[in-house]
Amino acid sequence: GGVLFVDEAYSLARGGEKDFGKESIDTLVKNMEEHKDNLILILAGYKQEMCWFLETNPGLRSRFPIQVDFPDYTIAELQEIAELMLSQRQYCFNEEARLEMESLFLEILHKSREYSGNARLVRNIIEKSIRQQAMRLVEQDQVSRNDLLTITRNDILLASQN
């Protein structure tokens, strides 16, 4: 018994006949039946791919009667996540950087509504910005404590290009 969480579950069905994806799906279905009283199986992934995945095996959709759709984060929520991630690492944005992040989120979400509004996007930008900040500070002769803690607009611009 227990709980099994499978993220990006649709990837099990992508490989075709020569990999073990189909066998994995068949095993999951079999175990769901054999342990229906003490096994919770949670499948996660992007909505469109999950719909496709549930059609790849007869009866798979009916075995998952409860489906929960989590909407993408809003620009304000992405901004809040970015601020939180930075503060957890003991960094902060200056005001220009904060505005640039908001502009960047708007641009990314405008280009591709699908898959953009998630925390992974924010984490990647934050991590790249911190690396850009470090590369910028290495070039300076004098570095203040504030310099060490502050992410600038230019750090974000360079991070978003890589």
Residues covered by each model-derived region:
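C-terminal functional regions that serve as terminal interaction/effector modules
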Residues: G1-G2, F70
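Canonical AAA+ ATPase core
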Residues: Y10-E17, I25-P71, A76, Q88-R89, ...
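C-terminal engagement/docking regions of AAA+ P-loop ATPases
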Residues: Q132-N162
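C-terminal helical "lid" of AAA+/P-loop NTPase domains
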Residues: G117-E139
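Hydrophobic positions in the central parallel beta-sheet of the AAA+
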Residues: L4-F5, L41
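Conserved C-terminal "switch" segment of AAA+ ATPases
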Residues: E49-T56, R61-S62, F70-Y115, A134-D141
